[in-house]
C-alpha cells in the first residue's frame, strides 16, 4: 500500500526526511484510484533491482506483502486475465460480498483460501479467476521449492508473540492519534471511496467507515487491530516457507550489525 500517493500514516511510510540520503523506490507511484496488481509490480520492481545492481550497489527489498516480495525474489509466473470472467466474479463480489466466493475457493483450493483469508474479496476473485482459467489451484502457482531470481539473502525480524500483539495494537492507536482520519478525509476528493484496492486497505477501510458513521471510533480501531493481527500471522506463515531465511531478534541492540553480518 506504500505504492499509493497520500497513504502515509496508515502504511507507516518512511518520510523522505528519514531516508538518510539513500534512494527509496516505488513509493507514491499510484493514485488511490489505480488498481495495485502484483503482476504489474513484479516487472517494475525487478527493473529497479537491476538498475541498482548495475550501479554496483546492493538493493534491499522490504516487505510487506509476502506475495509481492516473493514475486520479485523468486521465479513466479502469473497467468493472464479474462475480462468477462473477472467482471462476472466482481459482480458476484459486489452483490453477495466475499463470503460466498470464499466458500467456493475453500472447496476448490483450501490452501489458497487459508492464505488469502475470508475478507480479501479482490484476492479471492483473482484466485478463482486463475483456477477457472488454468484448471489448476492458484496455490499451484506458488513454487514448493522456490528458486531465487537473483542471488538473495533473506532476513526476518522475530519477536515474542505477546509482545508483537501489544506492539501491533499500539500501532493502530498511534495511526488514529497521528491523524489517520484527516489523511483519509483528504483522500476522499481524490477518489479513494471508488477505488478497487486502496479503499480496502487495513485501517483505511475502517477509517472510511468511521467517517460515514458505519463504525464508532472504538469499533474502527478494534476491527483494525483484529485484521492487523490476522495479517501479521499470515506474514509469518508465508515467510517461514522461505529457504535459508535468517531470523534476527527485533530488539537486539546490535541488530544492524547482525543483519550486515548475514549479507
Swiss-Prot record:
Alphabetical keyword list: ATP-binding, Magnesium, Nucleotide-binding, Transferase, tRNA processing
Enzyme class: transferase
Entry cofactors: Mg(2+)
Family: Belongs to the IPP transferase family.
Protein name, as recorded: tRNA dimethylallyltransferase
Any one GO molecular function term: ATP binding
Catalytic activity annotation: adenosine(37) in tRNA + dimethylallyl diphosphate = N(6)-dimethylallyladenosine(37) in tRNA + diphosphate
InterPro entries noted in UniProt: Dimethylallyltransferase, IPT, P-loop_NTPase
Subunit: Monomer.
The keyword Signal is annotated on this UniProt entry: no
Enzyme Commission designation: 2.5.1.75
Residues the record marks as site: Interaction with substrate tRNA: 65, 86
UniProt function note: Catalyzes the transfer of a dimethylallyl group onto the adenine at position 37 in tRNAs that read codons beginning with uridine, leading to the formation of N6-(dimethylallyl)adenosine (i(6)A).
Amino acid at each position: 500500500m506504500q505504492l499509493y500517493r497520500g497513504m502515509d500514516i496508515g502504511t507507516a511510510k518512511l518520510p523522505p526526511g528519514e531516508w538518510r540520503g539513500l534512494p527509496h523506490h516505488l513509493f507514491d507511484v499510484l493514485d488511490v484510484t489505480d488498481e495495485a496488481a502484483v503482476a504489474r509490480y513484479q516487472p517494475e520492481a525487478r527493473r529497479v533491482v537491476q538498475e541498482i545492481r548495475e550501479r554496483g550497489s546492493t538493493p534491499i527489498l522490504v516487505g510487506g506483502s509476502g506475495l509481492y516480495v516473493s514475486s520479485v525474489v523468486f521465479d513466479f509466473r502469473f497467468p493472464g486475465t479474462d475480462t468477462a470472467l473477472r467482471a462476472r466474479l466482481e459482480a458476484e463480489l459486489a452483490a453477495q460480498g466475499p463470503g460466498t466466493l470464499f466458500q467456493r475457493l475453500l472447496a476448490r483450493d483450501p490452501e489458497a483460501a487459508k492464505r488469502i483469508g475470508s475478507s480479501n474479496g479482490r484476492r479471492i476473485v483473482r484466485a478463482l479467476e486463475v483456477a477457472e482459467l488454468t484448471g489448476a489451484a492458484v496455490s499451484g502457482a506458488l513454487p514448493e521449492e522456490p528458486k531465487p531470481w537473483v542471488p538473495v539473502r533473506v532476513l526476518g525480524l522475530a519477536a515474542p508473540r505477546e509482545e508483537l500483539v501489544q506492539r501491533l495494537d499500539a500501532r493502530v492507536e498511534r495511526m488514529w492519534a497521528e491523524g489517520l482520519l484527516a489523511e483519509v478525509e483528504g483522500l476522499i476528493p481524490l477518489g479513494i471511496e471508488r477505488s478497487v484496492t486502496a479503499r480496502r486497505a487495513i485501517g483505511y477501510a475502517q477509517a472510511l467507515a468511521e467517517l460515514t458513521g458505519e463504525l464508532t471510533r472504538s469499533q474502527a480501531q478494534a476491527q483494525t487491530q483484529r485484521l492487523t493481527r490476522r495479517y501479521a500471522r499470515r506474514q509469518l506463515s508465508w515467510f517461514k516457507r522461505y529457504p535459508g531465511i535468517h531470523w534476527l531478534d527485533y530488539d537486539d541492540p546490535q541488530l544492524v550489525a547482525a543483519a550486515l553480518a548475514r549479507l
